[in-house]
């Protein structure tokens, strides 16, 4: 754990291992495979693959990464698409799983996959994406491994049209409306100032203060403030609300959940959760708080309270916040589905 989608060139991803979509003879292919060979060094990588010689579809083998910013290349042999009637789904899931097992064997902490079989192999992108997410998610729920799924474009995402349209409408009704209101207020304010400046410039015979609108006129001094009761810093500290760590652990206990279940459902690593657990005054990032809200299946009101305990609040000007609020309202608590929507809108994902 965790699992994140990124938009990048896989040959530039800094991970312990990157995965090459390979053929059974481990020969250089086109597209992503060619890019990996060129970045690693064609002669060295070709020689290493020739020494292995062969690999069956649904399996993966390992070579050094040579010139890549990684330690290893896992060559996962991908199935070509033949209509889905020849065991392609099982082979594709096997290719992912075999590469993930190699990551464990070689003590990798991170591995980066392209979307296997979706290019020249002809696998429908939405189906290929679903198999990738399902297989990776199942694996990282049981292993401490950071997995990146490297995508070039949004066309790879398996977001249903109905859900996407619903999110679009929700954003239009809330995020856009809020920003339009701010824009209208700012525009009215600018128009008012411009009219006042024009009036002042048009009549130079009067002193500036006579041209000023009433809002700038002299005002009587404010009444003296009532003396505030003295409060020591110690008093203030004693009256602090529940800390983020305390509230988080209480919510887990109240639901009768295991810590491991919650941090995995929240796309948080075991090490990260341990840091939170051991520090009552831990100061999390906002995306971490929101990730736990999804992992704990909180309501919007409960999420507001959890955010407040960490010093945050939902922002009307944040598209990410509106997407998360939509998911909470609709009870979409699958962290990968939430992150897929965030990725679709170029927003920071939740979790690690």
Regions found by a protein language model. Give the residues of each.
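Glycine-/small-residue-enriched capping loops at alpha/beta junctions
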Residues: 1-103
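Phosphate/ribose-phosphate-bearing ligand recognition and processing surfaces
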Residues: 80-208
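Short, basic-rich loop-to-helix N-cap that marks the start of a DNA-contacting helix
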Residues: 280-294
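The alpha-helix within a helix-turn-helix
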Residues: 252, 263, 293
């Amino acid at each position: 754990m965790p699992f994140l989608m990124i938009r990048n060139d896989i040959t530039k991803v800094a991970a312990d291992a990157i995965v090459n979509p390979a053929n059974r003879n481990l020969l250089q292919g086109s597209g992503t495979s060619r890019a990996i060979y060129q970045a690693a060094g064609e002669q060295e990588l070709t020689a290493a693959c020739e020494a292995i010689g062969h690999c069956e579809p649904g399996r993966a083998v390992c070579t050094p990464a040579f010139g890549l910013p990684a330690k290893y290349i896992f060559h996962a042999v991908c199935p070509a698409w033949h209509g889905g009637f020849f065991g392609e789904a099982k082979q594709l899931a096997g290719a992912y799983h075999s590469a993930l097992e190699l990551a464990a064997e070689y003590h990798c902490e991170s591995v980066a996959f392209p979307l296997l079989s979706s290019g020249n192999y002809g696998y429908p992108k939405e189906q290929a994406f679903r198999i990738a997410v399902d297989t990776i998610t199942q694996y990282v729920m049981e292993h401490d491994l950071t997995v990146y799924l490297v995508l070039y474009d949004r066309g790879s995402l398996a977001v249903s049209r109905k859900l996407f349209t619903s999110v679009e409408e929700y954003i239009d009704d809330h995020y856009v409306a809020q920003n339009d209101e701010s824009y209208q207020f700012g525009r009215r304010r600018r128009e008012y100032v411009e009219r006042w400046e024009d009036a002042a410039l048009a009549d130079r015979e009067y002193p500036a203060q006579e041209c000023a609108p009433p809002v700038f006129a002299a005002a009587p001094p404010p009444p003296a403030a009532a003396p505030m009761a003295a409060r020591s810093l110690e008093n203030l500290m004693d009256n602090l609300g529940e800390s983020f760590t305390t509230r988080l652990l209480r919510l887990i206990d109240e639901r009768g959940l295991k810590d491991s279940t919650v941090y995995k459902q929240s796309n948080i690593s075991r090490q990260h959760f341990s840091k939170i657990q051991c520090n009552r005054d831990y100061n999390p990032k906002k995306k971490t708080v929101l990730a736990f809200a999804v992992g704990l299946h909180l309501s919007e009101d409960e999420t507001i309270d959890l955010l407040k305990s960490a010093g945050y609040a939902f922002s009307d000007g944040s598209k990410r916040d509106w997407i998360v609020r939509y998911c909470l309202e609709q009870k979409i608590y699958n962290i990968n589905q939430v992150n897929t929507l965030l990725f679709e809108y170029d927003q920071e994902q939740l979790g690690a």
